[in-house]
Regions:
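FAD cofactor-binding and catalytic pocket of flavoenzymes
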Residues: 6, 35-142, 190, 197-204
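Glycine-rich loop(s) and the adjacent beta-strand/alpha-helix scaffold that form part
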Residues: 1-62, 199, 218, 224-229
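A conserved FAD-binding loop/helix module that cradles the flavin
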Residues: 204-226
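Flexible loop/turn segments at secondary-structure boundaries
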Residues: 17-19, 59, 116-119, 165-168, ...
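A glycine-rich dinucleotide-binding beta-alpha-beta segment and adjacent secondary-structure elements
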Residues: 134-206, 212
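Short, well-ordered loop/turn elements at secondary-structure boundaries
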Residues: 4-7, 12, 103-104, 151-152, ...
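A residue-level signal for conserved active-site and pocket-lining positions in enzyme catalytic cores
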Residues: 42, 110, 146, 174, ...
Length: 230
């Protein structure tokens, strides 16, 4: 296999892939220097997905936008909620009865700040996440909010039985030293000069909302540092 050499390498492969690359690189011969904090302080942003069935009528989720917007549930503090439709799903070759049913459902989500007590490890060449929903009380609040939404609207709300996230964060966190973090304030990996992380793996805490802006701000900060002379 060929080799490429560079003074600086920026990892922005997404939280899961960045962790996988770091674990694999640290275990290969002549690879990365050890990272004691790798895999610690991992989170899922308390994402919980569900669906809300609306009453029959002219309205269809196929003619909605992917994101309709955020909303609050009275009496529930902490989580953020939002909903959206399924535009374009009706163009797929699905049975007519299934399309009629899906047209009545809205995509529903709740999310918030989880504790970061979860972790990730690399076992048998596979990245494994250790996440216990029971350690995150916010999930109970989100499920309770879904129940309130159903009782107040009179329309069924269904939540997935297990958390399902697209907002993983951490595992290669910003920290003050190698024992408490994987990257320093510049985004450079401790013990591995010239290696930088600019994605959600470096976040030291949950954002509690879609984290794209926070990740973009972090990447911009690291890029600014790389652009400086010296």
């Amino acid at each position: 296999a060929g080799q490429l050499q560079a003074r600086r390498v920026v990892l922005a492969a997404g939280t899961m892939n960045t962790l996988r690359l770091l674990f694999a690189g640290s275990r290969s011969s002549g690879g990365l220097a050890p990272m004691p904090a790798l895999g610690r302080r991992f989170g899922a942003n308390c994402d919980l997905m569900g669906a809300w069935m609306r009453k029959q009528g002219a309205w269809s989720s196929f003619s909605s936008t992917p994101s309709i917007g955020a909303f609050a549930v009275s009496g529930i503090e902490g989580p953020e909620f939002g909903l959206g439709g399924f535009p374009g799903l009706d163009t797929l070759p699905l049975p007519a009865f299934l399309k009629r049913r899906l047209a009545r459902w809205l995509f529903l989500y709740g999310m918030g700040v989880d504790s970061g007590k979860a972790s990730a490890s690399f076992e048998r060449e596979r990245l494994t996440v250790h996440y216990d929903e029971r350690q995150e009380p916010l999930f109970r609040d989100i499920r309770r909010a879904f129940g309130l939404l159903q009782s107040e609207s009179g329309e069924p709300v269904r939540a997935l039985p297990k958390p399902f996230t697209v907002h993983q964060w951490g595992g290669a966190c910003l920290g003050p030293d190698p024992q408490h973090g994987v990257v320093d304030h510049r985004g450079e990996v401790y013990g591995n000069p010239g290696l930088y992380i600019t994605d959600g793996a470096a976040l030291p805490a949950a954002v509690g909302a879609p984290p794209s802006v926070a990740i973009a701000a972090w990447a911009h900060h690291v890029a600014d540092g790389l652009a400086q002379p010296g």
